[in-house]
Amino acid sequence: MLNPSAYALGANRSCIRDLFEYGCQRAAVVGRENVYDYSLGNPSIPSPKEVDETVRRILDDTDSLLIHGYTSAVGDYATRKAISDDLNARYGVSTVPEEFFIGCGAAPELVSVFRALAVPGAEILAVAPYFPEYKPFAQEAGLEFKVVPADIPSFQINLTAMEQMITPSTQAIILNSPNNPSGVVYTEETLKGLAALLERKSKEYGHPIYIIADEPYRELVYGGVKVPFIPCLYKNTIVCYSYSKSLSLPGERIGYV
């Protein structure tokens, strides 16, 4: 017998996936160069040459049993240390490898985090507009999913609306900056205001309210725009990162929490 709630989550088709399949069909007829695919987030820019060079070097110089074998449950230590060292150098933070878990891209990382926060009756808040898969991820984990309207026309976080929607059952706020689909980058001023609000509400309710920072687009900014690193502004932040966008590697499924 099938789990009815799980079946219900997968019963409705994704229009994004349907568009991707349609694009593949059209490409077979008119040629891929004549199809402009705005469905999935597949890159149109090749991965950096250093990625291919590194893959070749690893294949040539490393024991295949190590390449294709299991790692520790939390991921290879050297990889976690490299990530930690990189973030420390870029953002002036003091992370250690033990704080990181290697994941198969941001989506399963988010699912794991949602499940970890899904105590009975818990809820999670997203800021509109949001990546559509957040909702089924949260519902599958057993979380109530609520949406905070954006501050129009800036699309920054509407802190007044956020405060009205936070309850004692609120476990986390999920943020995506730069945002998919709006492209907005939440400013440091906005994030500091959110941090102050969450610190106050956490103290009021007697438990931490986390920020889940979904950051696959962290490096994809232009015109000198800077993306604030949220852990620098709010202690109870869980970062879910993927190299799918920054290195054009969506098929490799590499990321970290």
Q: Predicted segments — roles?
A:
Residues 215:
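Walker B catalytic acidic pair
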Residues 44-48, 181-184, 219-220, 248-249:
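Short catalytic/ligand-binding loop motif for oxyanion handling, primarily in non-cytosolic enzymes
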Residues 7-11, 149, 182, 244-246:
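Glycine-rich "substrate-gating" loop/helix at the edge of Rossmann-like oxidoreductase active sites
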Residues 48-52, 222-226, 251-253:
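Short aromatic-enriched loop/helix-cap "lid" or pocket-rim segments at secondary-structure transitions
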Residues 231-257:
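Active-site PLP attachment segment
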Residues 2, 9-105, 112:
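N-terminal small-domain helix-loop-helix segment of the aminotransferase-like
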Residues 211-212:
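Residue-level marker for buried hydrophobic side chains located in beta-strands
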Residues 64-206, 218-234, 238:
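Conserved core of the PLP fold type I
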